[in-house]
């Protein structure tokens, strides 16, 4: 009798776990629901945990405040989905008072409830690069599955993305460490292509060549986090705080970078970034 009861209990637990698991379609649905609810200025439409945490540009707020009060519909969505961790991230272009804003959201889902919502909002004039008009169609490469032979383990994908940030921070110094970039790799910052095109008075260079030359020398990167990792598609989201000293003026930038990795080489980087105050925080550990 005890054995039967134990079997029933185990089966019930398994069914409960299966019922609360959020697969790729489920996670994307949460992202879409978030963007749609935000466009309607009604956070009550979202299934959230009582202890849900929400930040906007590093500041903790009550869900429904900030951009929620002014955001309109989105015209572009690029997803990164991590069923293993229950995390999802997306980049979007969102209308605000008739003007486009570039938006990033990361959600953590547990037991079919949103427990964390981390967002970045970049408006015109709040970043060095701002080209939402170029963000019309999500790049197909991020939705392509990586062949089994070229897939990397979760830990390796994180190392590859972190190595990129190390290269950016050490470029132009004796401690420079190369990033695992594919020869054809491209980087886009707030919609603008910043590799293989003339930049900062320099001729067109590959992503690797820019770093080798130390084109962005003097950047400090901290608070690295990699909460979203999609092994099947080779996609990693890295979140960092970057400190720059350009022409004697200090600037702090919150950045979300979405990496596409194939065969242990980064093939594309899509970044959303926004300038914040010198005393800013990420809002997350």
What residues fall within each predicted segment?
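C-terminal and inter-domain tail/linker signature
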Residues: 16-285
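Hydrophobic h-region of N-terminal signal peptides that target proteins for export
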Residues: 8-17
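Sec-dependent signal peptide recognition
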Residues: 1-8
């Amino acid at each position: 009798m005890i054995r039967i009861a134990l079997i029933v209990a185990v089966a019930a637990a398994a069914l409960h776990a299966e019922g609360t698991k959020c697969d790729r379609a489920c996670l994307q649905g949460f992202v879409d629901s978030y963007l749609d609810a935000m466009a309607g200025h009604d956070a009550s439409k979202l299934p959230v945990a009582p202890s849900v945490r929400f930040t906007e540009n590093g500041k903790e707020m009550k869900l429904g405040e900030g951009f929620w009060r002014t955001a309109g519909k989105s015209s572009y969505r690029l997803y990164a989905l991590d069923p293993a961790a229950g995390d999802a991230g997306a980049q979007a272009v969102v209308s605000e008072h008739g003007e486009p804003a570039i938006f990033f959201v990361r959600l953590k889902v547990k037991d079919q409830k949103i427990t964390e919502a981390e967002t970045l909002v970049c408006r015109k004039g709040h970043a060095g690069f701002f080209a939402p008009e170029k963000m019309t169609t999500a790049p197909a490469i991020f939705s392509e599955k990586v062949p089994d032979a070229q897939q990397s383990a979760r830990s390796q994908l994180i190392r590859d993305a972190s190595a990129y940030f190390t290269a950016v921070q050490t470029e132009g110094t004796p401690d420079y460490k190369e990033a695992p970039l594919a020869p054809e790799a491209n980087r886009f910052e707030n919609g603008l292509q910043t590799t293989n095109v003339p930049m900062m008075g320099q001729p067109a260079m590959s992503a690797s060549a820019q770093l080798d030359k130390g084109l962005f020398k003097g950047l400090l990167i901290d608070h690295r986090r990699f909460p979203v990792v999609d092994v099947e598609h080779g996609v990693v989201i890295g979140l960092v705080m970057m400190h720059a000293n350009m022409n004697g003026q200090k600037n702090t930038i919150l950045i979300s970078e979405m990496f596409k990795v194939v065969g242990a080489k980064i093939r594309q980087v899509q970044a959303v970034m926004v300038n914040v105050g010198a005393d800013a925080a990420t809002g997350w550990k």
